[in-house]
């Protein structure tokens, strides 16, 4: 009752073709398709770039052993200064 039937859709399609013509509709379709293709390509390039350059932080990570030796060296310096 309130929905659009197939006949109404066909009438709308015929009116659109008469207004714009088949060449213009084909051109719009190809432009839209190339835009979607370019968007997908850019998204896939961005994902590959971000995966390759992804870091947890901006500084270099240190070994746990190095952190312990650096901490003990700092404690020794603090004791010597005091």
Swiss-Prot record:
Which residue spans traverse the membrane?
Answer: 1-21
Which biological processes are named by the entry's GO terms? protein transport by the Tat complex
The record's note on quaternary structure and interaction partners says: The Tat system comprises two distinct complexes: a TatABC complex, containing multiple copies of TatA, TatB and TatC subunits, and a separate TatA complex, containing only TatA subunits. Substrates initially bind to the TatABC complex, which probably triggers association of the separate TatA complex to form the active translocon.
> Could you identify this protein by its name?
Sec-independent protein translocase protein TatA
- Which family, according to UniProt? Belongs to the TatA/E family.
Gene name in the database record: tatA
The GO molecular function terms of this record are: protein transmembrane transporter activity
Listed A to Z, the keywords are: Cell inner membrane, Cell membrane, Membrane, Protein transport, Translocation, Transmembrane, Transmembrane helix, Transport
- Tell me the function of this protein: Part of the twin-arginine translocation (Tat) system that transports large folded proteins containing a characteristic twin-arginine motif in their signal peptide across membranes. TatA could form the protein-conducting channel of the Tat system.
* A GO CC annotation given for this chain: TAT protein transport complex
Q: Where in the cell is it found?
A: Cell inner membrane
